[in-house]
A protein has these predicted regions:
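Aromatic/hydrophobic pocket-lining residues that form π-stacking "cages" and hydrophobic walls in ligand
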Residues: 28, 138, 190
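Active-site-proximal helix/loop segments of hydrolytic enzymes
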Residues: 59-64, 70-74, 78, 84-185
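Single conserved hydrophobic/aromatic residue that forms the stacking wall/gate
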Residues: 189-197
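N-terminal catalytic or cofactor-binding beta/alpha core of small enzyme domains
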Residues: 1-76, 85-91
Length: 197
């Protein structure tokens, strides 16, 4: 798993990785390991370089680490890229599941094409259909067990490093309007996993 490490939540303490999407990744790691799924959790920050936020280059910085991890651990079957969405301050992405307030999640897919320009040749991705399939399967499974837990699947024109593995999930866990507890709860108290697919 990798993430935009500086993405934080309402009430997050500045400078603490555990209060950002990295801390949410820690919860997901623990949850998957409880299901006997081996996890390589990349806790590095790719959207800040030399103390300066550089979100536009984060995917380039992360690509090297993804390649390195896939080479080092060739048995990796699923790549999960965690993010936190940015929404209007009045937008609340909260649901209640298992008696807990939790952030809604959104599966995000890069298509390497736009309706205006067609295929983006330099962003070739042989796994577009595979990635869409796992997002759709996860969305259906979540809707079956936890109605209202997921938002719509978001489709965007670029690639988002989804070309390295046929099962890549880019997941937006809540938004800046969610508390850290809501973000962590959504992965702590729900159970569909990529193994279910």
């Amino acid at each position: 798993k990798r993430q935009h490490g500086s993405e934080a939540y309402r009430g997050s303490r500045k400078g603490r990785k555990s209060d950002t999407v990295i801390g949410v990744g820690d919860v997901l790691t623990k949850r998957l390991e409880q299901k006997n799924i081996k996890v390589v959790h990349d806790r590095n920050i790719y959207d800040v370089k030399n103390g300066k936020e550089e979100r536009s280059k984060a995917y380039n910085y992360a690509a090297t680490a993804i390649e390195k991890n896939l080479k080092k651990y060739p048995s990796i079957q699923v790549v999960i890229d965690l993010h936190r969405d940015g929404v209007n301050e009045s937008t609340k992405l909260v649901t209640r599941q298992n008696g807990k307030r939790m952030a809604q999640i959104m599966f995000f897919n890069g298509l390497s094409r736009t309706t205006k320009t067609g295929d983006i040749e330099y962003l070739y991705n042989p796994y577009i259909v595979d990635n869409l399939a796992i997002s759709f399967q996860m969305q259906l499974k979540a809707a079956e067990y936890y109605p209202g837990f997921t938002r719509r699947i978001y489709l965007k024109g670029y690639r988002y490093n989804m070309h390295y593995c046929p099962k890549t999930l880019l997941i937006e866990v809540g938004a800046q309007t969610n508390t850290l507890a809501e973000a962590k709860n959504c992965l702590l108290y729900t159970s569909p996993s990529p193994r279910d697919m």
